[in-house]
């Protein structure tokens, strides 16, 4: 059950809330224990109203807050005023010192860039001040005179009052470049409009140097390549001015002794501008000479010595041929291995021609050898004494070997055939009487219808590649029997061998070399040389 005290406390809490407009008595539903209606006067509900003493205190606090804000704003304004005064004082001092750049205010040029090449350890002070006004030649000259008197940089005019003066602490050299996009004539000045407004001249490109040696000097106006010539523009004067600028630039890169300042310029040749112009003129001609047809640049093989070797004693190799253009025709299109093979065939043809010339010389040499053998035969007939038999490598078989060698030269059925060591100065051989032996040169496989393959066992032992094979011809007397071949048969066999050689135009490399070697021996000695032994 809820006691009456609790009911009263609840009524008191309800009375502290907002005072609604209600009757004097409020009906309350009570639980089962309490019955009846409690009457609460409305005045008790309004007992806790807002205090009136707090309103004057809040007004005083608000006034104090406003006062603090006013003081803060005054301090800020004073600080801004002092800062503004300091700036104005600094600007006034800069203008008095001649370090100011004054240009029209509210009319800043389009695309004006100021580039200063700063040297480490130096300070530059550059200040700009834009101001309305025009700049005439007289004003510009006065500015230049003032700047020279004060030992400062150059001043220039772009149709308006534009001053550029950069001061350094140590008054050293320095280059200042002020460039704009050139669009119209550079000499066009400022014209006043009918309304009295001031119009700007078109932007131009200016390069000014403040070197101590050239103070107040104006570098010429530069015009980009491709621009149409302007009115009143003299090319000769412009060219001369550009050359002077180039010479001055080269002079800046050299010291007092004339040497280059930078280490990477030491390898430059001391060329003048005339040399540069000559090189420019020769450039297109030199390029045109390089574009000539490559077909005229044919590779010539190196000259060969008679022994088939190049310089240095080694077998000459054809150098690698450079690749030619695709417009070449015929053999000139060959590159690499194909060109080397073509040169190899040309070399073999040349050797074949030399071998054929040597074979043409052999018949006349054989005739001379036969004459000499006839003379020796007369001497041997008058001699009373018989000389010992000639020594052959195979004993008594040498005579049969000689006869078979003359009848069937280089037959593959006789692997043991060996040449005879014969000399024309020796005496005759007892037994089958023979007056002498004639040594006929055979250039290997070139004259023989049946040749031995190189490297086979049928090649005679003890023979080197550069030695020629010898053909032994016997010259019998009329009393000799029919067992030995007649000289006519030998000549017919040799002529048949030469006829068999005629259709072949390209001999093997080894045979041609042997033929050349033996031909050289016959030319030097005048008679057949003895067969070599290993």
UniProtKB/Swiss-Prot annotation:
Presence of the UniProt keyword Coiled coil in the record: yes
Protein name: Coiled-coil domain-containing protein 9B
Gene: CCDC9B
Domain of life: Eukaryota
Pfam families for the chain: DUF4594
Entry keywords, A to Z: Coiled coil, Phosphoprotein
Coiled-coil parts of chain: 60-97
Compositional bias of kind Basic residues: 288-297
Native species: Homo sapiens
